[in-house]
A protein has these predicted regions:
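Beta1/beta-strand and adjacent pyrophosphate-binding region of the FAD-binding site
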Residues: 4-20
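Glycine-rich FAD pyrophosphate-binding loop
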Residues: 13-17, 26-49
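Conserved Rossmann-like nucleotide-cofactor binding loop
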Residues: 20, 44, 159
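N-terminal FAD cofactor-binding segment of flavoenzymes
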Residues: 42-82
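Short beta-strand to alpha-helix junction loop
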Residues: 93-113, 232-238
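Predominantly flavin-linked oxidoreductase catalytic cores and closely associated redox partners
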Residues: 114-251
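FAD/FMN-dependent oxidoreductases across multiple families
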Residues: 231-311, 324
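C-terminal helical "tail/cap" subdomain of flavin- and related membrane-associated enzymes
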Residues: 317-380
Length: 380
């Protein structure tokens, strides 16, 4: 097959299907003359699931505000902290919405529409290759197109060979990677959480300090457990999920019927607060979203990952005007570390000390709820 003639040089090539990647492309293109190309990464796998969305997501940028009406969302008014012992529990319920629950797939689809509406060139190639890079740009093949972008934005996992070529950080450490195991439940017959639901969760499932949730969604629910990857040899995700079902039943949140389809559970590995361990800057490349490890320690996905897009777009716009682009990309990390960096940390570091207080001190129950759902500091 004859090679396609190279396209005119692109300014930025954004890779990855995560909403953060689409948002980066949107912000780079808006009100500029930059040529911005967005490409999904072949074989990138991000299973659809329910995700908790901080209301702050919609105020990150004016272009995101309309999504509040377009997305099918379930409001959450607080958290209900359950334990293995039904007599030990606490709850904080706010008068206002503290979080939303929606479909990851729908958020991604709306962000893709937003990118197309902003004239981002969107590609879904069967093949993607980064061939080489030098002091003026990067040679890449996106489907049938040969591109030479000045800078790359990576928002998803690349093959190892291309990973090394770009000088991307080494694989995440085991203490950063957490296994998130979930099962979707269709319909609302599983539990009645009322018209102003609080979200049931465990902070210490089976005395493992693993977290678990029952997420109320627009058309169903989702059971989920999270554990450090280094604990997989000791605690099987399927066993933790089954134990969580038992805890919910003993706390009379779930009824004895119908049977939960645990055999349909799916798992993904998330680098929680991984951004704190890496620079997020490689050769002519910035990392955003999952590639940069911008999940919060509380497993929050959409808001913190998309927040990274704002800093990346701003850094790239400034760097493209400088004679030495690589040097101009490095302020990226310094920009987000004192704001988004604090948000990513979450309350986990002090959880062993906080846990007894959560069940007997209403002030601490409130603060931990706001820390998990809104990113506020527990210590004030």
């Amino acid at each position: 097959m004859p090679k396609t003639a190279p396209d005119p040089a692109a300014d930025v090539l954004v890779l990855g299907e995560h909403p953060a990647a689409y948002l980066t492309a949107v912000l780079l293109k808006q009100k500029t003359k930059l040529r911005v190309v967005h490409s999904t990464i072949p074989e990138e796998q991000n299973p659809d699931r329910l995700v908790v969305i901080n209301p702050g997501f919609f105020t990150l940028h004016p272009l995101l505000e309309p999504l509040r009406r377009k997305l099918d969302l379930t409001p959450v008014y607080g958290l209900q902290f359950l334990s293995d012992d039904p007599s030990v529990r606490s709850e904080y319920r706010s008068k206002s919405i503290l979080a939303h629950v929606g479909s990851y797939k729908q958020v991604r689809a709306e962000m893709a529409k937003l990118a197309a509406a902003q004239d981002v060139e969107c590609e879904t190639p069967k093949e993607l290759h980064i061939h080489r890079l030098d002091e003026t740009g990067v040679d890449a093949t996106v489907g049938r197109n040969q591109l030479r972008p000045t800078v790359l934005v990576v928002g998803g996992a690349l093959p190892d060979k291309q990973h090394r070529m770009l000088g991307l950080p080494d694989a995440w450490e085991n203490d950063v990677v957490h296994r998130y195991t979930f099962v979707r439940l269709s319909g609302t017959r599983w539990a009645d959480l009322g018209s102003r639901p609080v979200m049931p969760m465990s902070l210490n499932l089976k005395d493992t300090f693993c977290w678990a949730w029952l997420l109320p969604g627009p058309k169903g629910m989702q059971l989920a457990v999270e554990q450090p990857a280094e604990s997989l040899g000791k605690f099987r995700p399927a066993d933790l999920l089954a134990h969580w079902v038992d805890v919910l039943r003993r706390n009379q949140v779930l009824g004895p019927k119908p049977e939960v389809p645990l055999d349909e559970a799916e798992s993904i590995d998330l680098p929680l607060a991984g951004a704190l361990a890496h620079e997020g800057v490689a050769n002519r490349t910035l990392l955003v979203g999952p590639a940069g490890g911008f999940y919060s320690a509380c497993t929050e996905d959409i808001y913190p990952n998309c927040w990274s897009a704002l800093y990346a777009a701003d850094a790239i716009k400034k760097a493209l005007k400088e004679p030495h682009l690589q040097d101009a990309l490095h302020p990226y990390r310094h920009k987000w570390r004192t704001t988004l960096g604090d948000y990513l940390r979450g309350p986990q570091q002090n959880l062993r000390f906080l846990l007894p207080l959560v069940y007997r001190n209403p002030v601490m129950t409130t603060r931990l709820t706001e820390s998990i759902l809104l990113g506020k500091s527990v210590v004030r």
